[in-house]
Amino acid sequence: MSEQLQPQQSMNAADEIIGRPLAQGLGEQTAMLCAERSITYRELDAATNRHGNALRAHGVGKGDRVLFLMDDSPELVAAYLGTLRIGAVAVALNVRLAPRDVLYVIQDSACRLLYIDAEFLHLYQQIAGELEQPPQVVVRGDEAPAPAIIAFKHFLDGQAATLESVQVAPDDVAYWLYSSGTTGRPKAVMHAHRSVLIADRLEREYFGIKPGDRVFTTSKMFFGWSLGHSLMGGLQCGATVIVAPGWPDAERVMATAARHRPTILFSTPVMYRNLLREGAGESAAMRDIRHFVSAGEKLPENIGQQWLDTFGIPITEGIGASETVFLFLCARPDAYRIGSCGKRVPWAEVRLLDELGNEITTPDTPGLIAIRMASQFVGYWKLPETTEKALRDGWYYPGDMFSFDADGFWYHNGRADDMLKISGQWVSPGEIESCASAVPGIAEAVVVAVPNDDGLTRLTLFIVPEDPSASQQKLSEAWMTTLRGTLSIYKCPRTIQFLEELPRTATGKVQKYRLRDMLQATL
């Protein structure tokens, strides 16, 4: 059973995130580093309050949605926390949205106010004329280009640096996360104020993060992985959060590490792969990092092993979801298995179920996972049927297949709707992908299936080679030898296709539906 939180009658998420370090006397401790800037907890609290007061002055109140189309910055953090502090709902958006997606999200959320960076303002301006009820717009970076748009500095002019938080019920909605859309249009995942009560536990209990530590998350803050374990968890620990503007790439990550010297790095499998390619093993700053943590998608075993060989420190793998914000399974630095996403964390309950809903207790038996934890979402915005399917009797059913071994280590076998029946037998794409990724010269491997002309399902393996100039024939032969020597014949893909890179969402997850579309177009 998970550890139960003591019930609270009222609270505010912003108080839990930055109120704790302030109550511990850490007001002069550095809360954030961003390029040349250093912001203390006292300064962050004051900026948070100014934003909260400004939002109120512009008619934003409890339950109103506030959207953020902003690059990561101290201003984003302060505005986000200010939104929470007045009981409004904070919604950080992917800064790479197309104009039509910006239109969709504004209409879907019925937002009251939009914070936007000047560099992204053109996205809004392209669709503003289609909005029947346009939000108030606050732009950071330039003077307001039109009377209907408010310049950032004018928005905050004269606003007090003190503000009493609005106390809300723990189950009141605090923020949304738009899902990354691996299968289509994203959903707004609604989270309650209570979700932040466990924000610091992974950092504290698994990695010993405390004041003086520096937390660096390579993903952008609109992604739950970064929002939960950087903005929320890192600050709640009283640590220093490294804020890195700009779209992340390996070179930029290493430059940020060299400048700010993080003690823990939260990242994704694709970034760890790119860091290895970029020569991260030669970086003194990277070698000084105590802990490396990975989530977002399954970490290929070859990347995990290469990292361990290079740094002598494992990548600690875990798994969470937009619907839980925080990880529900995670390895420990001193208790891990390459290829596994770890064990159940103490603050979550996890069950494995068969097709009839019976709990699976036998190791190495695939089943559907069910999760219950304090941070799980309260529902999908305006999608009651989808919510009812995912949330049942207090448990969250993500539709993912897992198994666990005799020692309690869990393994992600892919989405339940990705499970394939080949020659009358169920096949896990994850098993095939792990096997293919172990072949020397293969950087990434993804399996998808489409029906052939005969109506039968056939597997295709998409491969990204480590060296684009490598012989595809030799890689194909090595792949076939390895798979046929490891897997049952019905699990071996019939065809192989080479790609320079896999299609991904902005948060790094592979978009398998686009690969299926590619195959369908060739039939």
From Swiss-Prot:
Q: What class of enzyme is it?
A: ligase
Q: Does the keyword Ligase apply?
A: yes
A molecular-function term among this protein's GO annotations: 4-hydroxybenzoate-CoA ligase activity
| Keyword Signal in annotation | no
The record, for CDD domains, names:
BCL_like (cd05919)
A biological process (GO) of this protein is: secondary metabolite biosynthetic process
On pH dependence, the entry says: Optimum pH is above 9.
**EC number(s) for this protein?**
6.2.1.27, 6.2.1.37
> Which signals induce this protein?
By 3-hydroxybenzoate.
- Give the domain of life: Bacteria
Which UniProt keywords are present, listed alphabetically? ATP-binding, Ligase, Nucleotide-binding
The protein's annotated catalytic reaction(s) are: 4-hydroxybenzoate + ATP + CoA = 4-hydroxybenzoyl-CoA + AMP + diphosphate; 3-hydroxybenzoate + ATP + CoA = 3-hydroxybenzoyl-CoA + AMP + diphosphate
Q: Which InterPro entries match?
A: AMP-bd_C, AMP-bd_C_sf, AMP-dep_synth/lig_dom, ANL_N_sf, Benz_CoA_lig
Disulfides per UniProt? none
Q: What does this protein do?
A: Catalyzes the ligation of 3-hydroxybenzoate or 4-hydroxybenzoate and CoA at the expense of ATP. The enzyme shows low activity towards benzoate, 4-aminobenzoate, 3-aminobenzoate, 3-fluorobenzoate, 4-fluorobenzoate, 3-chlorobenzoate, and 4-chlorobenzoate. There is no activity with 3,4-dihydroxybenzoate, 2,3-dihydroxybenzoate, and 2-hydroxybenzoate as substrates.
Family, according to the entry, reads as follows:
Belongs to the ATP-dependent AMP-binding enzyme family. Benzoate-CoA ligase subfamily.
What protein is this chain from? 3-hydroxybenzoate--CoA/4-hydroxybenzoate--CoA ligase
Provide the species name: Thauera aromatica
**Gene name for this UniProt entry:** hcl
